[in-house]
Amino acid sequence: MSVLSTDLTEIASRLCSAGKGILASDESPSTMGKRLVKAGKDNTPETRRQYRGLFYGAELGGAISGAILHPEALDMKLDDGRSFVEALHSQGIMVGVKVDEGLEPMEASCGAYEGETSTKGLETLEERLATYHEKGARFAKWRAAMPICKDEYRISRAAIEKNAAQLAAYAELCIAHGILPIVEPEILIDGDHDGGVYFVETRKVLGECMHALVQRGVRLDHILLKCQMVTPGVDWKGNGPWRDPATIARWTLDALRQTV
């Protein structure tokens, strides 16, 4: 199958090749800049090009099926003159692109809890997708981020519905442009809740996402769902079964089976 295929089922199959993973290398210039400055480097386009070239120019084809790029990187080249996209394609690696434009606060007046967010970028997405496809991208990533409220031990219904609707709209647009969408409804692990709370919220979030996707006519074999393991919050101090990886695996599978 060509790395420039437009068959979404084939793209999904290739990205899920046995023994390979997807390289998440879509750091924004500001996020990358913090690392560069810490290493004593200036955060300039040229420095970012050199940094990214270290891995896009490496021999990754044996372990990586796809690489998610920041939009800036689609136009950058290695020192030998090949574009990053060309270098990845030469190894049979599919190119993806981060398409969301970050998070923005939700208003309490809509029923959201303090600190909850939705994701920016839908307004300009269709135009950008056409450009990304022309540049060789065949899959995309959009991240929603939902914290579990420390007072309520849950995510507000408003945040769940808003983020699920945005993910579904994004997926529909991607598919229309021959780009496979990675749907990422991330539930943040901040907090002191146990795994049971996370399980309940995972079921709510995944269930609403599946509903929103189906409502828009999105075929589930034309997306990749990126979700997390069902775990306690990072500040949880308890003991017992939630310390056991087998428990986490079982509850994660249960959440997926009950919703997807």
Model segments located where?
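Structured alpha-helical segments in the cores of large, soluble enzyme domains
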Residues: 122-139, 163-179, 205-216, 249-258
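Active-site capping/gating regions of soluble enzymes
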Residues: 193-260
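Alpha-helix N-cap and loop-to-helix initiation/capping positions
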Residues: 42-43, 116-124, 155-163, 193-205, ...
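Conserved, mostly hydrophobic/aromatic
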Residues: 44, 142, 183, 225
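Short, ordered loop/turn segments at secondary-structure junctions
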Residues: 28, 72, 144-147, 186-188, ...
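Active-site acidic/histidine proton-transfer and metal-coordination neighborhood
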Residues: 157-182, 186, 190, 195-200
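Alpha/beta catalytic barrel-like cores
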Residues: 1-137, 148, 241-242, 251-258
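Conserved radical SAM core fold
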Residues: 102-106, 146-152, 188-192, 232
